[in-house]
């Protein structure tokens, strides 16, 4: 299932970009969805705050079709006002106890494809962060990347370190400015004796900033922050109880609580702080459990929009915030979908306003 990585793949990075392939918007749409025209792509208004922040959007490299072109998505991300982009690279292992982690032959991009998209994003004027995440192909009950417990920890860290080295090489040769050394690995974050050589190896390969992304419910105890340059949090905070209304006042109160908690934790800390993921599915109830990736639910494009608007109202003027990455641009928009992407939905307007206000 996993693709071997090595010098042969690295040689592909220097190759000239392939000619453009068909736009992703020409691919078949999921059944039962409604096409919405993309919202106007005129340049976003200039930022109103003088703070030099990462105005970012995450782009999942999730296409299974090898002919898929990310170029049109990059153009949309620039048009919505992003100055930074996180290229999300899914890595796979069998379950939480395995150490067979690697790039999936069908569900992960090749290193050459990652390099091509990173170069294209840089040509479009964006700063690039390479952002690996771990997914489980056959998870047991309750398992996800936050509960990893490999039977052979040494083998897992060796393999993961090899992968980060390969991704760091791509990031270096393409001029990326940031590399995430991990995301939401809550059960492994305290193992600094194994993390330290991994991070040191990556630093020898990649000259840019290293980031770690902690889960929204685990950031206070993340010892791994001590080894990196920027502290990230995936911003899936519950903004309300399931029985509470999803109105502006309730959502703003939820974000104010989260902001107070984060700012109390940040007191005395010196590393830059960013939201590495800020995303909401377009379905009813999303603001009560933004982290819930489960399929199904009732589409609700307005609750998604209100969630982004609430974040803008509460956080856009926060002096201690160094950046935000919207999760996630990949995917089709439309009235019949419940996905995270804001493309072609009312949330796209709010994302434009949010990035412009940072």
Question: Which residue ranges define each predicted feature?
Answer:
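Aromatic- and glycine-enriched glycan-recognition loops and surfaces
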Residues: 63-79, 102-123
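Boundary/entry segment of secreted carbohydrate-active catalytic domains
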Residues: 32-77
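Short, acidic/polar
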Residues: 64-78, 157-170, 215-224, 305-314
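Active-site neighborhood of glycoside hydrolase catalytic domains
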Residues: 163, 188-212
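Aromatic-rich peripheral "rim/lid" segments of glycoside hydrolase catalytic domains that contact
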Residues: 36-51, 290-296, 303-308, 314, ...
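Substrate-binding cleft and catalytic face of glycoside hydrolase catalytic domains
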Residues: 80-99, 112-188, 283-286, 327-332
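Glycoside hydrolase catalytic-domain groove-lining segments
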Residues: 110-111, 116, 123-124, 131, ...
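The substrate-binding groove and active-site-proximal loops of carbohydrate-active enzymes
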Residues: 58-64, 98-111, 149-159, 182-189, ...
